[in-house]
Amino acid sequence: MTGKLIRMNRILETDGKTVIVAMDHGQFQGPIEGIKNIRKTLENIVAGEPDAVILNPGVIEKNADILGGKVSILCRITGASTNYSAMFDYHRITTTVEHAASIGSDGVVVMGFIGGNGENSSLEIIGRIGEECSKRGMPLITEMLPQAMETTSPTPSISLSEPGSPMNSELIF
């Protein structure tokens, strides 16, 4: 638990206000309008002093010199089909917790889907990643997306972040 606590303290501000910038969209969305040079964009983001950034492993590795010691790094370890695919594919594991730790990550981010076709497999992935995170002292952050649900209630997502949840998530978006 010591590793998780140390890493969580780097991610979360003590004043209760935390800014996390997501920059992991390129893996599935391709080039994003307004972001022509990811390195320059990251330099600008880091200069703004957010608490953490969410990045894909390759971006972390290529930009370690501008990230290290300046911002908490959250590594996206699941991914889906790209926007170029004819059919959406639910997230799969694309790298390991061990690899994320080896490149300096303070936490890992996984996507979860509830209320639709991707629910069972995504919850299984979150559970397996949660176990690995517990073994390695790595915080798990889950992004939960409701699918095919007729409610806008946050209750299904919130229930997965309850203390004692089998998902072991430290944060949920």
Each predicted region: which residue ranges?
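N-terminal basic/disordered segments at the start of proteins
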Residues: M1-E13
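Alpha/beta enzyme core
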Residues: E13-T14, T18-T82, M87-F173
